[in-house]
Amino acid sequence: TDDLGTQTSLLMSPDLFRARIKPWLKDLHDHIKSLADVKLIMHSDGAVLPLLDDLIEINIDILNPVQTSVRGLEDTQALKDRFGDRLGYHGGIDVQQLMPNATVQEVRWEVARRIHDLGRSGGYIISPCHNIGPDIPPENVVALYDLAREFGRYPLQLDAELAANNSYFARHS
C-alpha cells in the first residue's frame, strides 16, 4: 500500500517502477497467493492509469481507490471498457470536489453514473475515494448511501435513474 501517483502524474517513471518495484511486488504477491485463496487490493492514490496493466500482471485484483479527480481515472466507463473484469474497482465517488460542493441531485447523478460504469458485469465496491471529511454536507452522504443501497445491487437497474438525471442536467446546464 504505497501511493504511486499524484493528482496529475506518477511519482516515478513507469520504467523505474517496472525495473525496481514490480519484480519485488510480483514475488510478494505470488507468495501470498500461494498460501491462501485471497484477493489482493492495491491502495494507491493518484494518477496510476499508466501502471494498471502492470498491477494486473503482479496479481492485483482490486484497485483502491478509483480516484476520479486525478488524470486518467476521470472516465470510469473507459476504465471499465479497457480493463473489464481483469480488475476490480473500489471507490469512484470524489470527495475533493463533488461531495463537498455538489447538490444532492448532482451526488445522485455521480453515484448512478459510477455504478453504471464500474458495476456492469460486477467487480465494483462503491465508496468514497477517501474519508468523508467535515466539509461534506450530511445530506450528500445520505444521498450517496441511499442511491448505492437502492441501485447498487445485482442485477443493476439504473435506466430510470440515469434517464431522470440526464434530463435534469439537460435542463440545468
Identify the function of each model-found stretch.
Residues T1-S173:
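Active-site loop segments of alpha/beta catalytic cores
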